[in-house]
Design a protein with these regions (language model features):
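Outer-membrane beta-barrel translocator domains and adjoining extracellular loop/strand segments
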Residues: 31, 89-103, 149-164, 208-216, ...
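Outer-membrane beta-barrel transmembrane domain signature of Gram-negative proteins
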Residues: 213, 217-299, 311, 328-332, ...
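Outer membrane beta-barrel strand-and-loop segments of large Gram-negative receptors
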Residues: 236-238, 278, 284, 373, ...
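C-terminal extracellular loops and terminal segments
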Residues: 17, 426-430, 447-513, 517, ...
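Extracellular loop and loop/strand-boundary signature of outer-membrane beta-barrel proteins
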Residues: 51-53, 106-112, 163-171, 222-229, ...
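Surface-exposed extracellular loop regions of Gram-negative outer-membrane beta-barrel proteins
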Residues: 32, 37-51, 150-154, 253-260, ...
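Membrane-proximal, glycine/serine-rich, low-complexity loop/turn segments characteristic
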Residues: 1-155, 170-205, 233, 237, ...
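Outer-membrane beta-barrel transmembrane strand signature
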Residues: 437, 451-462, 582-585, 589
C-alpha cells in the first residue's frame, strides 16, 4: 500500500496492526519492515485528502492528493505525488591529487551550482475483494522524473610546482518516464491454504546528458571536454507465486520469484559512440516454516538465489543458498530476546555494471565495471527489547560479513592513459557493533518523549590486493517530541560522523530541524524550519593510500534556516475493504549512467 492508502484509513476502522521488523521469506531482499493493517468492513465508503508542504523562499515542495471509493466488493483509487527541489546556491569544494608518469598533479576547485529535480507519480487502483475468499488488485502507475545541474567554477591546477588558474563548467540533466502495471491475486483454498500471484511489468524511457569543460584562463587552452549522451530503453518484469499452508501449530510458506531487466543503450561519450544491450535475470526459490510453543517462537527458512547478468563483455552466473533462522523468546515484564541469522545474495546495480565512461578532471575518468560479480551477505543480530510506561527500547548486537563487496576505488586505466574511478569486488568487508534505539517518556505520557538511535560500529574492508582499511565511529540520531492536546512540537538533531563507504569515508548529513503541528478535525496545520543556523553539509574523502587523493565538501545555502508551511486534509467515511497483499515487488530502477 502507498502512504496515501494508509492515510485514507479512518482510525475507527482499524481492527489491529501487524508489525514485522524481520519480514517473512517472501519479502526477503526487498523490505526491512512490513506493516499489515487489518480493517473493518462497513458497507459503502469513500475517502479523499491532500497534503502540501512548501518552503517560502526556495524551491522545496512535497505534495500529494488521493481519492478512494468503495462499494460492495469493489474499491477504486486515484493518487498523485510530487516532490520538487530547486536550489541555486550550492557551493562545492573539490580537490584531486595524484602522481602520473612521475609528474605530480593537484586540482583545487570551487564550484557554485544550481540543481534540482521533480518527481511525479500518478496512480490508478482497482480492487475486488471477497473477504476470506479472494483478493484481486490492479494498479497502474506513471512516474515522471527529471533532474538538472548547472555549475560554474574556478580551479587552481598545479603540475609539479607550476600553478595555473582554470575555469570550469559542469552541466547535466536526466529524465525518464516509467509506466508500471502491477497485478495481484490471492485466493484461499479451503481453510488451511492460500495461493498468491503477483505480476509486474514496467518500462523506462531514459535520457541522460552530461557536459564538463575545463580550460586555462591565460590562453583559453582546453584542458578537457566531456560530452556524454545516453538514451536507454529499459523493460522490467517480475513474477511471483507463493503458497501458504497452515498446520495446527505452525505455518509453511513457499514460493518462487523471477525478475528480468533488459536495457538497450544508445551512448555517445569521450571514447566514441556505441549501441549495446544488457540483461539482468534473478530467480529466488524459498520455503519457510514458522511456529510458536509457549513463549518460544521460531522461523526456519531455506532458499536458493540465482543471478544471471549478461552484457556485451561477459556473462555472470551466480548460485547461492539463502538460509534464514529467527529464534525468539518472551521474557517476563514485557521483555524479549531474539536471534536472527541469514545469508543473502545481491546483484550489482546497473550503473556499477555500466560500460559508460565520463571525464571527471584532467587524467581522471569515472566508469562502471561489467565484470563485477554478485556480493553475498551474512548477517547476524541478537536483539533484547523491553517496554513499560516509561521506556520502549531495543538493544542489538550485530556482526555482518560481505563477500565480494561492491567498492569504488581508483585504478590505472589503460584505455584513457590516466586513472579511473570504478568498482571492484573487494576481498572482504565486515561490520560489527551495537545499537540502542527506542523512546523514553520521563512522565509516562506523550508530554515529553526522547527518541534515540545510537550505534557504535567498527567497519573493516580488505581490497583485492590485501590492503586493510578500518573505520570506527558512533552514529546517532535524536528527536525530542512534545504532544499536548492537539499540538505536537518536535526537534530532530544528530552528530555527524565519517563512515566507511567503499574506499571512501562519507560524513552523515547534518540534522537540526524543528516542527510544530496542530490538528483540528480532519485538518493538520504544520510549520517548521530545516537546518537551524547552518546549511546542509556533505563531505566525502578518499582513504589513505588511494592512488588519487580526493575530497569533496558541499554546502546547500538555500536550505539554511529553511522555513516551511504545511497543510493536510484527510477524510474517510464508511467501508474500507481489507486488502492484505502478501506479495509486494518492484522492478529495477532507471539506468542513468
Amino acid at each position: 500500500a502507498s502512504d496515501n492508502q494508509v492515510k485514507s484509513i479512518a482510525p475507527t476502522n482499524v481492527v489491529r496492526v501487524e508489525y514485522f521488523d524481520i519480514p517473512p521469506a517472501r519479502y526477503s531482499q526487498r523490505a526491512d519492515t512490513v506493516v499489515n493493517i487489518i480493517t473493518k468492513n462497513p458497507e459503502v465508503g469513500y475517502s479523499y485528502g491532500t497534503d502540501l508542504t512548501s518552503a517560502l523562499t526556495t524551491g522545496f515542495v512535497n505534495g500529494s492528493a488521493y481519492a478512494g471509493y468503495t462499494k460492495g466488493k469493489n474499491d477504486f483509487g486515484l493518487e498523485y505525488n510530487i516532490n520538487l527541489r530547486d536550489y541555486d546556491n550550492r557551493i562545492v569544494n573539490k580537490t584531486y591529487e595524484y602522481d602520473l608518469n612521475q609528474i605530480h598533479y593537484r586540482s583545487a576547485e570551487q564550484q557554485k551550482d544550481h540543481f534540482g529535480y521533480t518527481y511525479q507519480n500518478i496512480g490508478l487502483r482497482y480492487a475486488n475483494v471477497d473477504a476470506g475468499k479472494y483478493v484481486f488488485q490492479a494498479k497502474l502507475n506513471m512516474v515522471l522524473n527529471s533532474s538538472f545541474l548547472k555549475g560554474i567554477g574556478q580551479s587552481i591546477f598545479t603540475v609539479d610546482n607550476t600553478e595555473n588558474l582554470h575555469n570550469t563548467v559542469h552541466n547535466s540533466n536526466s529524465n525518464y518516464t516509467n509506466p508500471t502495471l502491477d497485478l495481484y491475486y490471492s485466493k484461499n483454498i479451503g481453510k488451511m491454504d492460500e495461493l498468491s500471484l503477483n505480476l509486474i511489468g514496467s518500462f523506462y524511457n531514459t535520457k541522460s546528458y552530461q557536459f564538463d569543460h575545463e580550460w586555462r584562463i591565460s590562453d583559453n587552452t582546453d584542458i578537457f571536454n566531456n560530452d556524454m549522451n545516453l538514451k536507454a530503453k529499459q523493460t522490467g518484469i517480475v513474477g511471483e507465486i507463493a503458497h501458504v499452508h497452515n498446520f495446527e501449530k505452525g505455518k509453511l510458506s513457499s514460493g518462487y520469484r523471477i525478475s528480468n531487466t533488459s536495457i538497450d543503450n544508445d551512448l555517445i561519450n569521450l571514447v566514441g559512440a556505441s549501441k549495446y544491450s544488457v540483461n539482468y535475470l534473478e530467480q529466488y526459490l524459498y520455503t519457510e516454516y514458522s511456529a510458536k510453543k509457549n513463549k518460544f517462537s521460531y522461523r526456519l527458512g531455506i532458499g536458493i538465489t540465482n543471478i544471471h547478468n549478461k552484457s556485451a563483455e561477459t556473462t555472470q552466473d551466480d548460485w547461492a543458498p539463502t538460509p534464514k533462522v529467527v529464534l525468539s523468546y518472551e521474557l517476563p515484564k514485557n521483555q524479549s530476546l531474539r536471534f536472527v541469522t541469514q545469508y543473502t545474495s545481491q546483484s550489482p546495480f546497473a550503473s556499477a555494471l555500466s560500460s559508460n565512461v565520463v571525464q571527471v578532471i584532467h587524467n581522471v575518468v569515472q566508469k562502471g565495471n561489467p565484470f563485477l560479480k554478485a556480493q553475498h551477505q551474512f548477517k547476524n543480530n541478537l536483539v533484547y527489547s523491553f517496554s513499560n510506561k516509561y521506556f520502549d527500547l531495543s538493544a542489538t548486537l550485530f556482526y555482518n560479513i560481505v563477500d565480494k563487496y561492491f567498492a569504488q576505488f581508483y585504478q590505472l586505466d589503460a584505455e584513457t592513459g590516466g586513472y579511473a574511478l570504478t568498482y571492484e569486488n573487494a576481498k572482504n568487508y565486515n561490520e560489527k557493533g551495537a545499537q540502542i534505539s527506542g523512546s523514553v517518556k520521563p512522565f509516562g505520557n506523550n508530554l515529553l518523549v526522547l527518541k534515540t538511535y545510537i550505534s557504535p560500529t567498527s567497519m573493516r574492508l580488505v581490497s583485492t590486493k590485501g590492503t586493510k582499511y578500518k573505520s570506527n565511529f558512533i552514529r546517532s540520531n535524536f528527536a525530542l517530541v512534545s504532544q499536548y492536546k492537539d499540538f505536537t512540537l518536535s526537534y530532530r538533531f544528530n552528530f555527524p560522523v565519517f563512515t566507511l563507504n567503499g574506499f571512501f569515508l562519507s560524513k552523515d548529513e547534518n540534522q537540526h530541524h524543528i516542527f510544530l503541528d496542530y490538528k483540528y478535525k480532519y485538518w493538520t496545520f504544520s510549520t517548521g524550519m530545516y537546518w537551524l543556523g547552518t546549511p546542509s553539509q556533505y563531505y566525502t574523502k578518499s582513504l589513505p593510500g588511494s592512488l588519487v587523493q580526493f575530497s569533496r565538501q558541499s554546502h546547500i545555502y538555500n536550505n539554511k534556516n529553511m522555513f516551511v508551511l504545511g497543510l493536510s486534509y484527510d477524510f474517510s467515511s464508511g467501508k474500507k475493504l481489507q486488502i492484505q497483499k502478501k506479495l509486494n515487488n518492484n522492478t529495477a530502477p532507471a539506468s542513468t549512467f
